[in-house]
Amino acid sequence: MRHIYSTYKEHYKALIFLGLPIVIGQIGVIVLGFADTLMIGHHSTIELGAASFVNNVFNLAIIFSTGFSYGLTPIVGGLYGTRQYAPAGQALRNSLLANLMVALLLTVCMTVLYLNIERLGQPEELIPLIKPYYLVLLASLVFVMLFNGFKQFTDGITDTKTAMWILLGGNVLNIIGNYILIYGKLGLPELGLLGAGVSTLFSRIVMVIIFIIIFMRSPRFVRYKIGFFRLGWSRAIFGHLNGLGWPVAFQMGMETASFSLSAIMIGWLGTIALASHQVMLAISQFTFMMYYGMGAAVAVRVSNFKGQNDIINVRRSAYAGFHLMITLGVVLSLIVFLCRNYLGGWFTDSQEVAAMVTSLIFPFLVYQFGDGLQITFANALRGISDVKLMMVIAFVAYFIISLPVGYFCGFVIGWGVVGVWMAFPFGLTSAGLMLWWRFHHMTKLPEPHPKT
């Protein structure tokens, strides 16, 4: 044990230093998700069901777009590791253009889905609530992608604190706006679920504006602005961004799609089941976002060492990240387990929803190991720019394994919403094992040749 600690000690410290600000920023996102669910749930159980459907659909678009923006991190991380600051700024400029194009493409796709929303089998009483909320969130997609471009750039140059403070500030603004607009305070109309959407749109616009101001005015970004403004558009960088971004986007998108399609299946079971699913998603985002923070730090460290062609420390960074991820998972799972009988009541006044939430805790706890495993090694592979096989792994894990298992357990066996959730441990753990194997294979150290 002591040997393991001495081997990985410096990596633990560096990952915590890089990852902690990202985790804190994600805690802000978690608190926002909790606040959204709490405020909407106490305003109306029907609105909570509508929010569950729309948020699941948009989580797919946002995670997909975020995955695409991740293509910037290994590029910037490698350039930063070799002190090429101007090209890193040029990469940011190209990334913002690519992100904007992806955002517009997603907006078109989500508009087509909106026009067919009544064909997805959701309860009729939810449709009038779903539509306006959906449109407001649709308008915010472009700003999510612009923010992601700046965030992945600052993460890649190991400045994780800037995005943390902007995220925290934006989330505080969003929560205040939620309270005012959902309940109709300060003389404004009571908008309910629509008010939550308007507040989200406004806060996302503000966060992008703040990031632009900081990048333009802060002295620490001067050496990057030279490349940003003078080097201009590059076909090679643009192609590299797309080559890295699309596979990661599809890998993360397929993972999220398994949750989103599961939400559609759960919607067939009624409003109560859908509301309980939304509460459990808010809880599961708590652990996912914490893992995400550490995973992002793994990607940055791995890309820095990859830029230096230091394979030993590439491997050590990844495995140190997994050690920290497992420790974090045990602590978070223990907290959720101890609070299992109270969680549902914190989010809604409905006893039926609260009871159903408690029944979903077991499958949630089971998939924590798999979630930590797949996040760690997906980010490690992203750090070494080995991303193409990730799409195949995601397809097998989430579409061949997870979704069929969810349908079988939920509807064929008749376990209902618990059965649908039982699929997640199978999908996430199988993905994690395949991603680990790929990373292990791609970073094998050459065996020393025997002396002759």
Per-segment meaning from a language model:
Residues 1-19, 76-142, 188-246, 302-367, ...:
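Short alpha-helical transmembrane segments in multi-pass integral membrane proteins
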Residues 27, 31-49, 117-124, 180-193, ...:
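Helix-terminus/linker motif at the lipid-water interface of multi-pass membrane proteins
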Residues 7-38, 42-43, 59-71, 75, ...:
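N-terminal transmembrane alpha-helices
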Residues 69, 137-155, 163-171, 196-211, ...:
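Short runs within selected transmembrane alpha-helices of multi-pass transporters and secretion channels
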Residues 48-112, 144-158, 162-163, 263, ...:
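Small-residue-rich hydrophobic transmembrane alpha-helices
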Residues 20, 24, 54-57, 97, ...:
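Hydrophobic residues within alpha-helical transmembrane segments
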Residues 45-56, 130, 134, 197, ...:
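Small-residue hotspots at the loop-to-helix junctions and early N-terminal turns
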Residues 17-36, 136, 147, 170, ...:
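Transmembrane helical elements of multi-pass membrane transporters/channels
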